[in-house]
Design a protein with these regions (language model features):
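Conserved Rossmann-fold NAD(P)-dependent oxidoreductase catalytic core, especially the SDR/UDP-sugar
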Residues: 99-138
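Rossmann-fold cofactor-recognition segment
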Residues: 44-56
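NAD(P)H-binding glycine-rich loop region in Rossmannoid oxidoreductase-like domains
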Residues: 54-93
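Conserved glycine-rich Rossmann-like NAD(P)H-binding loop of the short-chain dehydrogenase/reductase
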Residues: 28-40
Length: 138
């Protein structure tokens, strides 16, 4: 039997860590976290952590087979400056990684017979500046 969990990707960032603690404080007992970085030791009590990459299709397949994922909080991303300097990597993580997680959610939904909640927080920065002139002002 697969274990029912809430999945949080990109958990090692500031927002991800706050989310894990808040969800745990609200009584979410079955948190599964995923990040390319290890979880800080003081947060390991809140979740079962997997150190891995959202681009790793075999890892995502393993998650589908081992866990009954009822919700996904997708926080993993390459942001701003790093994304500008590594646009191919940014596209892979931000677009292809997100698509992989959406496919995972669809598979889980099919197995469960009910929707998987997919939360994808972002900011206005996701849209970028409309043109180079606007960007140069900042």
């Amino acid at each position: 039997m697969r274990k029912k969990v809430t999945l949080i990707t990109g958990v090692s960032g500031e927002v991800g860590l706050a989310l894990v603690k808040n969800l745990a404080d609200l009584g979410y007992a079955n948190l599964l976290t995923l990040d390319i970085r290890p979880l800080p030791p003081e947060y390991t009590k809140y979740s079962n952590h997997i150190q891995g990459d959202i681009l790793d299709k075999s890892l995502l397949n393993r998650l589908v087979s081992e866990y009954d994922i009822d919700a996904i909080f997708h926080m993993a991303a390459l942001l701003s400056t790093r994304a500008e300097f590594t646009p191919v990597a940014a596209h892979q993580v931000n677009v292809e990684g997100t698509m992989g997680l959406l496919q995972l959610a669809a598979e889980q939904s099919e197995w469960r017979g009910e929707p998987v909640m997919f939360i994808f927080p972002s900011s206005i920065a996701a849209y970028g500046m409309p043109d180079l002139e606007s960007k140069s002002k900042f």
